[in-house]
Amino acid sequence: MHGFGILVLILPLCLSAPANVRTVVVTAPVEIVTVTQVGTQIYSATSLEAPTSSLAESFTSSAKTTSLESSLSTSLSTSSSSSVPTPGSSYYNTMFKVWQRFWGDGKWNDNDSNCNDAYTLPVLWTMAVLGEAIVKTGDVSGVEVTLDRIMQYYDSATKAFLASPNDGVEVYSDDNAQLAWVFIDAFKMTGQQKYLDHAKDIVLYIQTQQGPNGGIIWKKDKNYIASISTVEAALAAVRLYDITRDNSLLEFATDCMDFMFKNLQDPQDKLFFDGTDKNDLGQVDKGKLTYTIGCSISTLVYLHKFRGDQDMLDKALELALAATNPGGAFYDGNGNWNNNLEYVHLLFAGFADAFRLSDLFGQYRDEVVKQGNYIYQYLQDPKDPSLYFTLIAASTRSTFDRYSKLFRGSFDDDDSVYCNNDPSQHAKKKLLVNASAVQILYFMANY
């Protein structure tokens, strides 16, 4: 995964930043906000179906936009003023705000329109996460128009997609795997063969990126075998198998997961390390991130579904236990998951697949819902309802003040979170972060 700008990832003190994280700058493995929990509350989410109105059609028709803004403004106001958190359909409200703030002139903008900055084209990672977020709202028009914009990233030489149309050399396996998921979902939504063909082409390309000792190379023509590229490739394969019934896809996915457990699992806490060198598997980067575990859980429960392999289910349960260990690498000192939203949303996705495919994961439901409610309550901007910050440490004073009603700690003000570095202006939001938030809120509504 990659992008532009600087985000700060809170890592456990024993870990270094994973090698494949392009959006994170960590100069020292320190925790920025140290807090002590003084209270918590768990709320259950309500199961909902996706609203049927098309946000894409609304934002490409000014006449419809005014009506939709009016109808949703009441919902936004109600959800932000209520004393009891009710995630419910909030994923739809957040998607509305994403269209409102990042869509204009027929294209997606990586910059928040509230800040009036110059246009910046989103990288492929962002577009893939955004595509899946739009899928969650059931908005066929939105998926189609977004995939149409993504076609400018297409690389005819590989039949995969570039990190950016402005860079004709960077092709990342993990970004392409996520995009394959979007094409697969688009095919299911529309029946259009072109979407299935693109998904097949992407998976075929990714299969050419297998290292000599297994695993999936993270970036074309490089040596790094990333955990995330390996497990996202496996997940793309099992999702594609669900349509094509090509058994070779299950073999490929199984090989990927076997590589992970053999070469990149920490024997102590059972989580996965970040990656290794394709020519020397002993060179292991020992960073750990939530999205690797989330994609692994999804892949394993699908493999169990399709093959009836008990070992796959047992391994998924092992990872679920490791991911929810409050003393583990994914937790801060307050019992909250410590990863940025753009990583942790795939852990929520993994549990969503697990809850749906096996009753054995029900023991983890309360913990996962608690984590989602933490995001809904404390990472949502109180001055900009339905939009989110990636971490409490990367938020605003008013956001932290609400947080500090239940948690004690310190907060360092950072003017760079505001438009034009001016605290009197809006806090700028990130497209990738809020596309991730849409997915988290959707899973919360359907657990």
Predicted feature residues:
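Short coil/turn linking the two alpha-helices of tandem helical-hairpin repeats
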Residues: 138, 187-188, 241-245, 304-308, ...
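Active-site cradle of extracellular carbohydrate-active enzymes
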Residues: 230-233, 237-241, 249-303
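Oxyanion-binding "anion nests"
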Residues: 292-328
